[in-house]
């Protein structure tokens, strides 16, 4: 919700200056802002009886929006990092929506395992290192992820969070089915062999 984000940014700038520390990024792009935006879209989908895919869920609260007609996607970054990582990674992990509390990350991990989240995406948005310098207002949002997505998800598999079969569903089968991508998402005769 842009109004909430703008209000939060204004409050942080008043409190901390023109470029507040990146540690407050999750307070600017807050749980409330994420939920209100997603809930508005979900309400419209229910009202008009249409399908909706909500990309980049980042909070536990958004998980309640999943239904048979409303699917959810989380990014690798939101499944791997938490707000505690801003202390060491700084703006290198600044993305939109902001990476949230450890409790949110853990809830997203449970949701990829139990099926409430049906797709894992990358939100691949690399930037020059110089563009990632600064705080919540000046550092560019986004990070490279395509080349790291599989190895990162394999780490979650090694931790016992998901199985290899579930990983394949989240990153291959489900996206192809959800978006009706012809001859993709499976290793089958006649399908594109885009596995390398």
Which residues fall in each region the model found?
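Histidine/acidic residue-rich metal-binding segments in metalloenzymes
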Residues: 1-120
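His/Asp/Glu-enriched, well-ordered alpha-helical/loop segment
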Residues: 19-39, 44-49, 119-120, 125-196
């Amino acid at each position: 919700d842009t109004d909430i984000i703008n209000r939060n940014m204004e409050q942080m700038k008043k409190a901390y200056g023109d470029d507040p520390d990146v540690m407050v990024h999750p307070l600017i792009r807050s749980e409330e802002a994420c939920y209100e935006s997603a809930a508005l879209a979900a309400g419209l989908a229910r009202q008009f009886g249409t399908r909706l895919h909500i990309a980049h869920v980042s909070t536990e609260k958004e998980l309640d929006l999943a239904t048979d007609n409303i699917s959810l996607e989380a990014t690798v970054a939101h499944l791997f990092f938490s707000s505690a990582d801003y202390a060491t990674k700084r703006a290198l992990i600044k993305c939109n929506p902001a990476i949230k509390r450890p409790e949110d990350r853990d809830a997203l991990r449970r949701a990829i395992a139990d099926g409430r989240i049906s797709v894992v995406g990358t939100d691949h948005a690399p930037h020059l290192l110089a563009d990632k310098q600064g705080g919540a207002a000046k550092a560019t949002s986004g990070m490279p992820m395509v080349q790291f997505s599989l190895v990162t998800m394999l780490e979650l598999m090694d931790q016992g969070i998901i199985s290899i079969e579930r990983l394949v569903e989240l990153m291959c089968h489900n996206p192809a089915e959800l978006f009706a991508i012809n001859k993709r998402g499976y290793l089958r005769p006649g399908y594109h062999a885009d596995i390398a």
